[in-house]
Amino acid sequence: AEIKVRDGYIVYPNNCVYHCGLNPYCNDLCTKNGAKSGYCQWLTKWGNACYCYALPEKVPIKDPSYKCYS
């Protein structure tokens, strides 16, 4: 079966984004989780956050309707 993918801000299980400063950190994080690539998006409403392209559906992405539960 084909793996379903989508783009988004990769999150921890508690819906918190991965904060970042540099693109290589995010690209590494995203590709380790099965994404095509990723980068550090600066100044999102959650701060600087990793964004992944073609991330497998099994890996959670930010759900803006929920808070980050720390």
Swiss-Prot record:
Chief location of this protein within or outside the cell: secreted
Residues of the LCN-type CS-alpha/beta domain: 6-69
GO terms under cellular component: extracellular region
Annotated organism of origin: Buthus occitanus tunetanus
GO molecular function: sodium channel inhibitor activity; toxin activity
CDD domains attached to this UniProt entry: neurotoxins_LC_scorpion
Compartmental location: Secreted
One of the GO biological process terms: defense response
Record note on domains: Has the structural arrangement of an alpha-helix connected to antiparallel beta-sheets by disulfide bonds (CS-alpha/beta).
SUPFAM superfamilies: Scorpion toxin-like (SSF57095)
Pfam families in the cross-refs: Toxin_3
Name of the featured protein: Alpha-toxin Bot9
Family, as annotated: Belongs to the long (4 C-C) scorpion toxin superfamily. Sodium channel inhibitor family. Alpha subfamily.
Cysteines paired by S-S bonds: 16-68, 20-40, 26-50, 30-52
Role of this protein: Alpha toxins bind voltage-independently at site-3 of sodium channels (Nav) and inhibit the inactivation of the activated channels, thereby blocking neuronal transmission. This toxin is active against rat Nav1.2/SCN2A and B.germanica Nav1.
Tissue: Expressed by the venom gland.
Keyword field: Disulfide bond, Ion channel impairing toxin, Neurotoxin, Secreted, Toxin, Voltage-gated sodium channel impairing toxin
